[in-house]
Amino acid sequence: MEIKVGCCGFPVSKNKYFENLNLVEIQQTFYKLIDEEILKKWRKEAPSNFEFTIKAFQGLTHTTKSFTWKRSGLKENEIKKLEKYVGNLKVNKITLEFWEKMLKYAKILNSKIILLQLPSSFNDNKENVEQTKEFLKNVETKEIKVVLELRGWKLENKRKIFEEFNVIDVVDINIDIPTKVENILYTRLHGKYEKYRIIYNYEYTQKELLNIKNKLIKLNAKENYVLFNNSYMFKNALEFLKIL
């Protein structure tokens, strides 16, 4: 089994990051449709064995009610025009164009994984199960692997999606296990959980890092993507590498 370790975003300079880690989940692609030249530059700067995964644009996953749209670079009237068409895996001309853009980003970066991270407001219900299925039926996925994060969903409803479609169930393995484990496991480690709240400002202990390692060994996926998303992500990622 192979364990790849990285962070959700670049918490340090890219040069320092490239020197120490071989994986990153790009966050900029979530907030806005960024210039392709920037991605070409990153691919050129990174080592040949460095892997980028892409967090899909919020226009696919988040409605315009989300505060994250403030970072989209769009004016209020431009966001307002998108209100009826974006988020919650809606399928229409606009969102399909967004998806095509993500595929283009993946090609530039030589990425094989695109993450769809749904907000907690995307509730676990029949309507959203069907909406997720409808989206996955309509998007091109031949050259990439979709990893899907459905926060707070029951196993029963997640199975309706992950057993029908060839997509990966993204979880924080500190609190959950994937619906199914085959070739790829993708885990995002957010920090500490207090009831229904995530404390991102949290540093994992050596004991917790060892526990994560042991869970990965037990689940025994061929390729394991371990992405730290807490405030101490870079420090914890380096510490985790040392114990592998």
Where are these regions (language model features)?
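Residues lining hydrophobic/aromatic ligand-binding pockets adjacent to catalytic sites
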Residues: 1-244
